[in-house]
A protein has these predicted regions:
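Ordered alpha/beta subdomains of enzyme catalytic regions
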Residues: 1-122
Length: 122
């Protein structure tokens, strides 16, 4: 797999929520379920695929100096939170359906068990 850093390919909302959790000292463990709402093209089912890419993304979650500098330039993040992001790496547990089975809308494809600020980016 590649070593591409896709960390900033997230909604800005997720990062602002993380800053709110950071400021309030809220970083309890959570369980997030990953699922999809509708089959692509209104098909009757889907096939679970892409787990290697998801794991690669999670393993490479981090904020580079340029990422943090970009976020600083937005003028909405506090310096102590940006410092936290500069040392960010995911730690937690991932439970996922293996590649290949047929899956349906609202089936849980993956559970993310981690501190809320880490789970938020997965």
């Amino acid at each position: 797999m590649s070593k591409r850093n896709l960390t900033l390919l997230t909604d800005l909302y997720e990062l602002t929520m993380m800053q709110g959790y950071y400021e309030k000292g809220q970083n309890e463990n959570v369980i997030f379920d990953v699922f999809f709402r509708q089959n692509p093209c209104n098909n009757g089912y889907s096939v679970c695929a892409g787990l290697d890419q998801v794991i690669d993304y999670i393993k490479n979650l981090h904020f580079t100096y340029d990422d943090v500098d970009y976020l600083r330039g937005l003028g909405i993040f506090k310096e102590d939170f940006l410092h936290y992001l500069s040392g960010f790496h995911f730690s937690g547990d991932i439970y996922a359906i293996p590649e290949g089975p047929v899956v349906f809308p609202k089936d849980t494809l993956m559970n993310v068990v981690a501190q809320i600020m880490k789970a938020k980016l997965v």
